[in-house]
Swiss-Prot record:
Expressed in most amphid, both phasmid and several labial-quadrant neurons. SMART domains: TPR. This is Tetratricopeptide repeat protein 30 homolog. Keywords: Cell projection, Cilium, Cilium biogenesis/degradation, Repeat, TPR repeat. It comes from Caenorhabditis elegans. The gene is dyf-1. Plays a role in anterograde intraflagellar transport (IFT), the process by which cilia precursors are transported from the base of the cilium to the site of their incorporation at the tip. Specifically required for the kinesin osm-3 to dock onto and move the IFT particles which contain these precursors. Component of the intraflagellar transport (IFT) complex B required for transport of proteins in the motile cilium. May be required for ciliary entrance and transport of specific ciliary cargo proteins such as che-3 which are related to motility. Component of the IFT complex B composed of at least che-2, che-13, dyf-1, dyf-3, dyf-6, dyf-11, dyf-13, ift-20, ift-74, ift-81, ifta-2, osm-1, osm-5 and osm-6. PANTHER family: TETRATRICOPEPTIDE REPEAT PROTEIN 30. Its main location: other.
Amino acid sequence: MNAMLNIKEGEFTSTIYTLIHEHKFNDAIRILQYQHERNPKNLAALSLLAYCYYYTQDFMNAADCYSQLSYNFPQYSQYKLYHAQSLYNAFRPADALAVVSMIQDENLLNESVKLEAAIKYQEDDLVNCRILVEQLPENDAAVIINTACIDYKEGNYEEALKKFNEATEFSGYQSGLAYSIALCHYRRGDYDSALKLISEIINRGVKDHPEFNIGMVTEGIDVNFIQNTQKLHESALIEAFNLKFAIYYRTKDFKAAKESLTDMPPRNEHDADPITLHNLAISNANSDFGDSSAKLQFLLGINPFPQETFANLLFLYCKNDYFGLAADVLAENPSHTFYCLNEYQFNLLEALIYMPTNPEESLKKLEKLEKECLDRLRKTAIEIQIKKEQKTTDSDDSLEMRNLIESYDDSLEMYLPVLMTYAKYYWDKRDYQAVEKLFRNSVDYCKEHDTWKLNVAHTIFMQEKKYKDAAAFYEPIVHKKYDDGILEVPAMILANLVVCYIMTNQTDEAELILKAVENEEEAALMMKPNEKFFHNSIISLVIGSLYCSKGNFEFGISRVVKALEPPEKKLGVDTWYYAKRCIVAAIELMAKNLLVMRDSVVMEVIQFLTSCEVPGRNIYTVPDDLFEQAGESKVKCNVTYEARMIKAALLMVFND
């Protein structure tokens, strides 16, 4: 065995301890597993194997090893405690409690009570958890921390904050404690204090653990993934970055939120903890529905998962019009429905899901929700006004005012989905005047909100003759990012604004936007040469579509074709969708003898469709993750297949 593993005789023990000291746990585990297979009752090998599993957060394998140790060596009571701790960390509270109850050693009494309290805490049995904690010595920092955790879970954040600070004074700086204090500040709405503590945790991590490669992924540096280890856990870095993400996501600084995730120590996706996986899913929900929904679905299958997962998955399905899937998930998970959704979320989801089949009932639910949301908004607005009139400079009052404003913003965020669901009902009926009336009635509460402005702009835009008014709503959204970050503005917003300018003869303003997008795409392409950028293409496609809709197909289609040059760089699901719409519309009119196009334009289109065949093989025109039924259907749902079919139809009409 030693020869096979290249370990010299007499150096086995020193080799194992060296590997552990150098944090090469996988190598140590491989050797110890082999040794354990040869001699299952070797105490040293099995205890070291258990330690390595525990240190690398593989708690189920650690529990299995400690179970064998406690059975084969009952004289060592600590193995039962370690067995229970492993089960607790593997989220097996009932099994952990059963093992704890078998520990008889008086020397382990305090540790056993602490673990039993932690198990009760994990099960949300806070009453018995507090009873157990109160049995422990008061001068123990762990007891102060445990009491603080109970206060936190009960929602008493002020008291929890005091106790965490007391524990820090008692035991000195610890990253885990600093994170707990930051979390209390976050719950209190004091984001500045939370971010200050998070920065300290991260700075210490950068200084003390350069091997964690903090921030290097954001800078585009290729680095090795790191493992989940006890050292990483003790640094509280993952928790700190996730809290930083939560703060920026809540304050709608989505760019900084994404950077929080890429800054954290890089790990393989299968090593990511549930919180990180959840945050990755929601951060990419708008750009990659398939990946986000897959992550959220996966999280629902593990225990525990972040409570927000269930609601976020359901709302993601509804946002993308997969109401049947949302209904199935809701029906298949009644326990999740009870524990993970509040009354507002449940009622809104029901209204969304049943709107296509039972609009009358859905509208009744929306009407009730709207009344509740507006009542809450009015009440909070009055409280804010009263507070403003008092004009105190006390810091506690300042925090209270901030919390009131945040409460108002939260109420507004609850009202907007209700309003938009209402609006969508009329939008789908193309009753844009009814939609505009709805938005006009909500102007007092929503006029400063970008989502409201954007949807008002879309509604006015669709009424065609109000392009100047639509531009007035689009402009503030675009101008925020005009000089730096215009690519962060969705391409359709830019395209609609350009169309507004064209239709109101403001060609100079339209050219300025096109030039700004072109310049930023060129700069971005230099930074990321292998990435595709579609903003300029989509804007040009929309302009081309506009000319086609006005009957000028030759100019419109030429603009569309040029927008996708070269196809290997510009072809994507969205760009192909707009391009094929114009071409198919032209073919239909040609087939009806209502349109004649010059031969040169037709040949240009044929050449374009041919050039799309190779890069279009892996670009699917329908979601390819959830709904693929068979290999044959998948073959027919890519750009290559559609380009060939359209080319065949065009040639048939052209040669007729």
